[in-house]
Each structure stands twice: as structure tokens, then as C-alpha cells.
Regions:
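Beta-rich carbohydrate-recognition and catalytic domains
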Residues: 19-214, 226-273, 288, 296-341
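Predominantly extracellular/luminal regions of secreted and cell-surface proteins
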Residues: 175-187, 341-377
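Aromatic, loop-rich ligand-recognition surfaces of beta-strand-rich domains
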Residues: 376-442, 454-508, 512-514, 522-524, ...
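Extracellular low-complexity, O-glycosylation-prone stalks/linkers
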Residues: 432-433, 525-551, 569
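Short, solvent-exposed loop/turn segments in extracellular or other extracytoplasmic domains
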Residues: 450-455, 548-555
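Extracellular Ig-like/FN3 beta-sandwich strand-entry sites
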Residues: 464-466, 529, 563-565
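Beta-strand-rich modules
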Residues: 557-579
Length: 588
């Protein structure tokens, strides 16, 4: 018996070694799935407690990605841009009287350390550094940083000179200043670098409709990137609450200017789709050297500062034009896998949304939070069950048996009772699939999950054939069982839609006196389309801006520079794929 066991042990080891490893997940889906903290500010939760963060920055350090964003009472690190590990940490000095624990943080690598500081209008904030940020191991680089800066960004140049960029105002400009990298005291005067010109640049106008209602627009969220000897000073505008919140960029041969407005602007922009907004972010490189842009996604329902984070493929074209590719940016997107990826072509996995506006059923409904709000591709609306009890459920009908490749479970905050970052929160659920709506198979079982997954995204190990998909609640992190989006991705049995017809761009001419910063885009309804993606740009081969449109055959495009010609294309999409694009349309 002993001899048999000894023989069995090597055999078991061999079988274990030969057993295939679980498939590595290849895609992610925005908003990124991290355990977002809840708003910690009492005045901001009068209409309901809710998760909130924004103003993200990512940098690589010692082979890992580090993500910091506003008021999370900590930060995340990841080895792969998919699995993010939270490190609890508060950076305010003892005695500080502020709810803004780490607002719009700046992060940069200098020497063998990662540095961080939050926004402050005083000189009472420390700069912290760590050589081992995978854990809470931080030390003061300077106890009181003597240069007050809101929305700060630090940039270390190739010659080891350090620069600070900052500003968040609808009155004052973006400033720049050289900082001593040893003492962290200012070198030379503060320089005015950028201001908004919303009379020329349409996207810089304040308001959801770009009409400067209520306030003048804000310039904020500085970030500096150096590429091929050029300095790209990035900024957010016009307001974090709006779908058109984006990032623009100016370019210079010197770190403190003078700067020239890039013709393609905003370079990061996502005014349509499930997630909206792509402003106040940071541009960084992955482990293979490819460029990405992380930025703020707006919700702004329970408070103007209810937001999430998104990551978009980015890059520089052959002419040095900085772009971020947000086309299908909230659909499954391939993670980085090798050097030289074509981010202008995008990283979209071509798994289509299968359940937009399709029939739904639910176990119960709370008030006006009706079930269709979980399939309408608007993260600002949501379905809520009456309780958080185990057994509450939500079901979506795909309309036809389809190939399901991935599912995103977006929870909403209904009657949450948490403020700030609270450890120990977790979601538990099961996902089931059915061909006929009667016989069900569990395809994802997270009934024993112990992590907080507010925007959980599951790439199935093997595609599933299904017409119906159901989620059953087991445990909620807080509040009632509520979903802003149960999004099912894959391919349906239908053919891709036919090309869009009768696409026109209506724009005022120079003599009309009407507003040339906007265009009215119209096209013929495609009966076989779920939605449309419009591409625009300042040259026929630089259509880097995209807008996703559902349920309409027109769009008011308000992001144009007044005296510049623009070029447009459009394509339709449905559950079966994407049509060919229309001919390029010039709008002078």
C-alpha cells in the first residue's frame, strides 16, 4: 500500500503538470472593474450614498501598473491592467481638516521611487515616495510641499529636471513651473501656459449641450507626455459632469512652452454610449511600449461628482498626432499583448452587444426604476429590485439564440449605506443561460465570491449558445439589488447591417453668421441596425474622434474648431457585426 502511494505521487504530479492552465482572460470592458470607494463628503450624498472617483492617473513602476484616483483612501496596482489589487492608505497629514484625502492626485517615477501628492490650495500637504508601493510602505519626500497646486501633474524630463503643471478653474489658466527634484522648492516663476478658447473650440463650451449654460467652462486635469522630443501638455474641459468631458492637448518643443493647439482635439472624447465622458486623465505606456489613456467617466446622477474610470487605447500617428481611440470603447477590448499594436485601428474584440433594448423580466421593481433601464445603454439609469434579498433576479431575452462570449454586470447604488472606503464589501451572484427560457444552466457561479465587483466583467472560458440570460442575486455589497446594465456580448445569428445611406453634415457657412463650431449630422434610418458610430477628424486619414449613437438618425456634433474643415464617416452595427463605412464626407 505504501509502495503504491509512492508511485501515485509522481504520477499525480505529472498529470498536474500536463493539465492545461485556465485560459487567460484576453479582454476588459469599461468602466474598469475596481472596488471603487463611496463618496466620503456629507454634502455630496444628500440624494443618495454612492460610489465615486475620478481624475485617474496610471504609471508603470517596477513592472506593475499603479492607479491612483480621487478620494479612494488608497490606490491599486496590477500586473496586467486587468486584475487590480487595492492597497489601503491615507496620505493626509495628521490634523488636516479636509474631506479631500487625495483629490486629483499626481504620480510620477523618479529614481527608484514612486511619488504621489494630492491637490491642495495650501502648503500643508506632503509629497510621499515609496520604493515598494505594492504594500503600504510610504515615506515623506517633503513634509510640506511649498507650492500649492490643484489638479497637479509632475513631469521628470530626460535631463532629470522636474516640472509641475496645475490648475482647475474657469477663471485662471493652467500654470507650469520648474521644481527642484531634491528640495521640491520652486525654481523660477510660475508661468501661464494654457487658457480655454471656447469661442473657437466648440468642445470647450460648458454644459451637456455645449451652450455655456450657467457657468463659463473649466480647464483642469493637467498631464504631460514627451514623445519624439515633443512635449504634449494635456488638459481636461469643460466640466466633469458632462458627456462631452474630454481631454485636449497642446504641443511644444520645450516643457514650459510656448505651446501650440493640436489640430485634432479633443484627443480623448466619448460623448455617447453606455459610458460617457473621457476627460481629466493620463497617458501612459504598457509593458510592451504601447500607449493608453485613462480618464474620467461621468454618471452625475446622485451628485455631479458621481464618476468612474475608463481606459482607452491611445497613440501617436506618423505625424506626431496624439489620439485616444474610444470607438466601441465600452465594449470588450483586448488587453495589451505585444509591442507595436495598432491603436488607431483599435483593440475592439468585435463581440457585439446582444441585448440592447430587448425584452426583460425581473423578480420585482422598486418604484420608477423599471427593468428596461438595465438594457438601455445609459449608465445614468438603472433597474432596482425592491430588496437585496437572495433570490431577486433579472432576465434578458436576446431575441434569438446567439453565441455569448462575455457578460458585464454593472451594479447601481440604490439605498446604499456606505461612505468612504469600507473593507469587507462583496457581491455574490449566479449567471444562468437558456435556449428556451425554461431549462437553465449556470454559466458563471460567483455565489462564494468575497470581492467587491461593482462593474464585474466575465469573459467566458468557452462560448455559450443562449437566447436568455438571467442573473440571480445571492448577496449585495450594500443597498438593494440594482443594475445599470446587464450587458451580454458575443455574436447573433443576423448578418451585419447594410451601409448607412444619405449621410449629411449640415454646417453654417462663413457668411451666415450661424455657429460654425457645431454640425447637424443626419442619415437615413437603417432598419437592420442597433446603432451607429460616427467618425470625425481634421483630415480624411485622421478620423480619430468617434461618437456612438443609439435610437436616433441624427446627432448634434459640437466639438468643432470654428474655422477648420472637418471630415466624417458613419457605420452601422447590430448583433451580427459592423457595416462598411460610408464615403468620407467633407464639411468646410
Amino acid at each position: 500500500m505504501t509502495f503504491s502511494c509512492l508511485l501515485a505521487l509522481p504520477l499525480l504530479s505529472l498529470l498536474a503538470a500536463l493539465a492545461p492552465n485556465p485560459p487567460k482572460q484576453l479582454t476588459y470592458c469599461n468602466p474598469i472593474n475596481v472596488d471603487y470607494g463611496f463618496c466620503p463628503i456629507p454634502n455630496f450624498v444628500t440624494q443618495g450614498k454612492h460610489r465615486a472617483t475620478a481624475d485617474p492617473a496610471i504609471t508603470m513602476f517596477k513592472g506593475d501598473y499603479y492607479l491612483f484616483s480621487t478620494n479612494q483612501w488608497g490606490y491599486w496596482w496590477s500586473p496586467d491592467m486587468l486584475n487590480w489589487h487595492f492597497v489601503p492608505r491615507k496620505f493626509l497629514l495628521p490634523g488636516a481638516n479636509s474631506y479631500d484625502e487625495l483629490c486629483a492626485p499626481a504620480i510620477w517615477v523618479m529614481g527608484d521611487a514612486l511619488y504621489v501628492i494630492g491637490s491642495t490650495y495650501t502648503d500643508q500637504f506632503a509629497i510621499w515616495k515609496s520604493t515598494n508601493p505594492r504594500v503600504d510602505d510610504w515615506h515623506e519626500a517633503i513634509h510640506h510641499f511649498p507650492v500649492p497646486a490643484w489638479d497637479p501633474a509632475f513631469f521628470l524630463d530626460d535631463d532629470e529636471r522636474l516640472y509641475l503643471y496645475h490648475g482647475s478653474s474657469n477663471t485662471f489658466p493652467t500654470y507650469g513651473q520648474e521644481i527642484d527634484p531634491t528640495t521640491f522648492h520652486a525654481i523660477g516663476p510660475k508661468v501661464e501656459l494654457l487658457t480655454l478658447h471656447d469661442d473657437i473650440h466648440g468642445w470647450e463650451r460648458f454644459g451637456e449641450h455645449g451652450d455655456n449654460t450657467f457657468l463659463r467652462p473649466f480647464i483642469e486635469g493637467s498631464w504631460m507626455t514627451k514623445h519624439d522630443g515633443k512635449y504634449y501638455l494635456q488638459y481636461g474641459a469643460p466640466g466633469t459632469e458632462f458627456s462631452g468631458y474630454g481631454d485636449g492637448v497642446y504641443v511644444s518643443d520645450h516643457p514650459l512652452g510656448p505651446f501650440t493647439y493640436q489640430a485634432h482635439n479633443p484627443f480623448s472624447y466619448k460623448p455617447g454610449g453606455f459610458t460617457r465622458g473621457a476627460g481629466h486623465g493620463a497617458t501612459y505606456q504598457d509593458a510592451f511600449g504601447n500607449w493608453w489613456h485613462v480618464s474620467t467617466i461621468t454618471i452625475a446622477v446622485k451628485n455631479n461628482f458621481e464618476r468612474r474610470n475608463g481606459i482607452w487605447p491611445a497613440g501617436f500617428d506618423k505625424d506626431g498626432v496624439l489620439f485616444a481611440n474610444t470607438a466601441y470603447g465600452d465594449y470588450p477590448t483586448y488587453l495589451p499583448s505585444q509591442a507595436g499594436e495598432d491603436h488607431a485601428a483599435g483593440r475592439f474584440a468585435h463581440w457585439m452587444l446582444l441585448n440592447y433594448a430587448k425584452p426583460v423580466l425581473a423578480s420585482s421593481t422598486l418604484g420608477s426604476h423599471s427593468p428596461n433601464f438595465a438594457v438601455n445603454e445609459d449608465m445614468r439609469t438603472y433597474w432596482s429590485a425592491k430588496t437585496a434579498n437572495q433570490g431577486e433576479w433579472f432576465q434578458t431575452d436576446l431575441g434569438a439564440v446567439s453565441t455569448v462570449r462575455a457578460i458585464q454586470v454593472n451594479y447601481a447604488d440604490q439605498d446604499a449605506d456606505v461612505m468612504g472606503k469600507q473593507p469587507g464589501l462583496y457581491h455574490q451572484y449566479r449567471l444562468l443561460a437558456s435556449i428556451d427560457g425554461r431549462r437553465w444552466t449556470v454559466i458563471v457561479d460567483k455565489s462564494h465570491n468575497k470581492t467587491d465587483v461593482p462593474h464585474d466583467y466575465i469573459e467566458l472560458e468557452n462560448p455559450v449558445q443562449a437566447r436568455f440570460v438571467k442573473i440571480e442575486n445571492v448577496h449585495m455589497a450594500t443597498g438593494k439589488f440594482a443594475l445599470s446594465g446587464l450587458r451580454v456580448f458575443g455574436l447573433g445569428p443576423t448578418a451585419p447591417p447594410k451601409p448607412v445611406q444619405s449621410f449629411v453634415a449640415l454646417r453654417a457657412d462663413d457668411q451666415s453668421g450661424a455657429d460654425r463650431r457645431s454640425a447637424w449630422l443626419k442619415w437615413q434610418v437603417s432598419d437592420d441596425a442597433t446603432g451607429y458610430v460616427i467618425y470625425s477628424g481634421v483630415a480624411p486619414d485622421k478620423l480619430y474622434t468617434s461618437v456612438m449613437v443609439y435610437g436616433a438618425n441624427e446627432y448634434y456634433f459640437t466639438a468643432m474648431t470654428k474655422d477648420r474643415p472637418y471630415y466624417f464617416q458613419i457605420e452601422a452595427f447590430n448583433e451580427g457585426g459592423i457595416s462598411s463605412r460610408s464615403a468620407v464626407l467633407e464639411s468646410k
